[in-house]
Amino acid sequence: KLTGYYKYIPKSVNRGGHGELTNGKMDKCSIYIALCKWSSRFRVNTQTGTFVDLNSSDIIAYGELSDAEASRTDMKEYEKFEIDIKYRNLTTEPTYILIVASASKYGDYFTGGEGSSLYIDEFELGFDYNAASFTNE
């Protein structure tokens, strides 16, 4: 489980347009964690369209901030978040931990609201057993 505190101040999307975020809509943040089986570090390259494929079999486990939490527009103070990590593969040992926090969910596609701000504090990666992490629900 990944926990921490966040404060998100979104702006209207005024750059690009990707997925559900088009010009004029309110920006969304993104916080996620993935446990990966890679042979070396993964390098994102926006010029060649090289991005992490979160549906790849190399992603052993994954968890993300809920859409409702990522869409908040009324935050005045830091608020706690908890992201459960769901395992997709119980037999492969991951080699990398990937943690992403972005003020614009599709910032890697050059989409977002200029001035959207995401503040993060007290990241903690918990290792207590959680049965829910090992189900496909």
Residue ranges and their predicted role:
Residues K1-K7, Y32-A34, K80-K86, Y96-V100, ...:
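Residues within well-ordered beta-strands of beta-sheet-rich folds
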Residues K1-S40:
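Extracellular-facing segments of soluble proteins and assemblies that are Gly/Ser/Thr-biased and enriched
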Residues V13-G16, R41-N45, E93, Y109, ...:
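Short acidic, gly/pro-rich beta-turn/loop elements at beta-sheet edges
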Residues G17, T46-T48, L98, T111-S116:
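Surface-exposed beta-strand edges and their flanking turn/coil or helix-capping segments
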Residues G19-K28, I85-T95:
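Short, surface-exposed loop and linker segments with low hydrophobicity and enrichment for Pro/Ser/Thr
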Residues S40-P94, G113:
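Extracellular carbohydrate recognition and processing domains
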Residues M75-E77, T92-Y96, S104-D128:
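Extracellular carbohydrate recognition
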Residues D128-E137:
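Residue-level detector of functionally pivotal "anchor" positions at catalytic/ligand-binding pockets or at interdomain
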